[in-house]
């Protein structure tokens, strides 16, 4: 759980580091990260190092996720960064190669923020007998972002926010990869 005071501290650290961002007009030049959002991904190898209490929370949440899911990981955050999506921005469907678990912590969102989606890459999903479609058996899963929400997922799982353009004035997410 992140308090409102801690959320403000996270926003302050992002604000101090925002000057290093550049608008990536070249997104789409590789298969890893596509879209038109601003990101500290290329500038920050480990953004969480700037916010020790948040790094500790991420470790604790990931440790519990690993315990419940049975993943074998090295107990090390490989890299972390923040993304800022302004109005009409998106992040195309992508994965996080070279890591085991990835996470997205929503810092600033509102009712107009684009949803986070996950895509089930199993082509057989549509050939099984399913009585009821839900988030456990559907090809696409959508999450409405809310501030202070942490979502953990396997790094191989395709995800993004491009199915709907962001209509919020600003959507801020801290992301990380766990090795």
Predicted segments with their positions:
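Non-heme Fe(II)/2-oxoglutarate
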Residues: 1-69
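Solvent-exposed residues in well-ordered beta-strands and their adjoining turns
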Residues: 2-3, 85, 106-108, 177-179
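Active-site region of the double-stranded beta-helix
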Residues: 43, 48-78, 86-100, 107-111
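Short edge beta-strand segments in beta-sheet-rich domains
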Residues: 77, 138, 169-173
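Catalytic core of non-heme Fe(II) oxygenases with the double-stranded beta-helix
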Residues: 83-152, 162
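A short hydrophobic beta-strand segment most commonly corresponding to one strand
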Residues: 103-105, 168-179
